[in-house]
Amino acid sequence: MIISGRRRPPRRRGWAGATFALGLALIVAALTQPVAVSAAEHTTQTRTPQVTTDWRQYVQTPKHSDVCPVSVVSTTGPVEGARNLLCGGTGSTTLTYTAEGEAPTILLDYGQETGGLPYFTVSAKSGSPTLKAAYSEGREYMSPSGDGAAPWADGDSSRFDTYPVSGPATITNRYAQGGERYEQITLSDPGRVTLSKVGIKYIADRTQASGYQGHFLSSSDELNKIWYAGAYTLQTDLVPANSLPGSWSIQDGALSAGGSRVNDGAGVLNRGSSWSDYTATFRTRILHDQAGWMARAQNSQNGYLFILDDSTDTGGAPNTLQELSVHDGAYTSIGSVALPSPLAEGTWHTVATTVSGTGISILLDGQPIDHVDTSALPAGAVAFPSGTIGFREFGDEEASFKDLTVVSGNGKTLYSNPLTASASLPDFTPPGSNAVASVLDGARRDRAIWSGDILVEGLTDYYSVNNPEYIKQSLDLLGSRQLSSGFVPGALHPASVAHLGPLTPGETASYSATYSMYFVADLASYYLHTGDKDFVTKEWPVVQRELAWNATRLDGNGLLSTRAGVDGADWDFYDTDKGGEVSAYNILYYKALLDGAALATAAGDTSQAAAYQADAGALQKRINERLYDPTSGLYKISDTQSGVAQDANALAVLYGVAPAAKQAEILSELKSSLWSTPYGPHPFSSDAGNKDLVSPFVSGFELQARLAAGDTANAQELLHDVWGHMIAPGPNQTGTMWENISGQDGTPGLGSGASLSHGWSTAPTSALSGYVLGVRPDTAGYRTWTVQPHPGDLTWTRGNVPTPHGDLSVNWTADKGKNQFSLTVNTPEGTSGTIAIPVSGRTGTVVVNGDVVWRHGSFAAAAGVTQGQFESGYVHLKVKGNGTFKVTSH
């Protein structure tokens, strides 16, 4: 059939199927399965742990891409040698299922969150057995069908898979199971299967400890585990370029292009974008409806497309060649021709396509079928002067391809491959595979690029593995899909390709006004930490159009007004949309305007920077006039809802909307109003009618706000309650951070469908480095920076923060009994900054590299130290020049 349906847009966040669940996750250096803890064990486990002096011991990244299970949780039925499947195991495992007997089942534990392509090596079989495998992140959610919701974007559409076993072979799952700790193997049909090995081919980022450019270590084992759990959570959500397997495979000695809806089922060769004149020859066998191929393709969404409809095609015109121009996913017919004879399914045919100048000729089994003149295309069609080749099968269409050869106009072989072995697949970007690196929201679900999640994930990346390319490419994809209104979509499939043509018509798309604005905040954060001005320049027009669209949503009060059911959704997808003047949305808009001003300055547009600054100032005034409630001392949910919102008040403090004199009161009232569970704050007061779920995403903003405001004690309490709970031993511990938490009992908040490795929950990683260790950029690319530790009850912390100029390392110790603080800062070349050291009062003494620079409230310059002042319990020292600054206070 011809181009009937495009991939449906992303539905609202989360799983709309069976009951949702969250998962308890974390830190997995424990290779044993989680079990019920006895009283004696509990006493041992709650003693203060010994903190290692080597931060590398906290890193959880799999050492090898072939991940093996570490323990057998249980077996039922006739199972022999289950432990032989574990890491380092020898021998084999046999499962036997008789018609009258119990089905054999093995529940395996991989020790922590992992994900990729499950595989099973069968060494023997008897009868006609069917192997079945199910997957779960948390142990309590394992069922015969796995743990619930599969992703709507990338990955296997089911949490279990079945495989008819025909004989000895390694069975590899065709699609990714992106996140699981537990795997249940059974037989669903009678027979016997002997397995010599099972495992998962890990496909996410696998940066080892040696590649971590940022690291953190403190006197608190819990905080250390939280930091590295956040870093590993991020890694499970990072997908390297071309790592997603796509929908193609090698079957029966040929490339099997089973129908896909991603990128309309099209995939292209990873070379040849500059090829102009050539002949591409291949053999094809239609298995259902049609066989499609592309020529002069720039990517799967741009090029010439040809489709052979077989004699039984149910959606198109049987025995027809369709010819189309595809531009940014829009299809325009440039011709069609009846085939000279019927084309039967299951028969092999040879196709030759010659592109030369403005002509395209197609031969079928050596017989000319048609010639297309691309200099005289119909209205709406786009001509392509160069590009590579590819194949396309959409939906339930299916065809096989082999013996591909591409020869240039002068007779040179450009590419030749029989397409009979799996080694051929990496030459292509098939539908479902990703041409560029990207960051997903969750390892299991949704497995999509989400702009709001990137705001947290980007910071986690910059402070840990420091692979900003994942963030950059994700933002590039989002920006390329901007609508004509200026609205930037908030969610994309990771296999999406960049939009190359004019802006797509429309006012709004997935997901909401806030997720559209997050693009600006994400880009500003990327620029602040990387200094990549070239990328800012490229995206600057996108920023301008986005902020122009935001301005169209201002109401008569000068506040952003959203529409429920149109653009009023936000992070709490399980609650109803919010319409009207929503406090949190307006505060995010305020931040977007400030970020827009910073990006305008980077792009050299100083007048626009000034305009955004003025708009932000006016918006701040209106927010405080209309949405702040002086009676409660807090910001309302909206102009129509007077309840308390965690996001609005935390963001008001963090982004400076709230006057400095009111910030301490806001944080105090916020704790009194919402800190009512042992697992962290409720995101809304009970009168708002929202679900009783703790949000690590929103709590991350509150964590940053409290640290920025100097409320370190409550920040540490928040860290323990929310993230300490997720890393504690339990049936849902995965070594990673959960999407949300039930305020009732601390279980995963939405049931078995929840993501237990969710990047938006990793704020502590950047917060601990940025505030507790104390390293933050002041200007783009760390040209200037601040080191200001917030020690709380810690006695020491040390770590490293990567910058474009080199590492910035910090080591501090606190002796509160003696009111002494020692701080060593190693600074990168070509930078300057501020070192703020805690002091007991204005009259304290501060020494830098042996020179007294502060005593009795007065500053004295020293080598590399140019200014000093006292403020809020710190002496702030301006320093310049690379080197080591050893600073002490008493």
Model-derived regions, located:
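Aromatic-rich carbohydrate-recognition surfaces in CAZymes
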Residues: 155-193, 222, 226, 236, ...
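Secretory targeting and sorting signals
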Residues: 1-39
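Structural helix-adjacent loops and short alpha-helical linkers that scaffold large soluble proteins
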Residues: 129-131, 173, 188-196, 223, ...
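Extracellular/oxidizing-compartment recognition motifs
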Residues: 40-439, 489-493, 561-562
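Short strand-turn-strand beta-turns centered on an Asx-Gly dipeptide
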Residues: 363-367, 532, 848-851
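Repeat-solenoid scaffold signature
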Residues: 690-724
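Non-catalytic C-terminal accessory modules of carbohydrate-active enzymes
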Residues: 713-890
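The feature captures the catalytic groove of carbohydrate-active enzymes
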Residues: 143-149, 154, 256-258, 334-335, ...
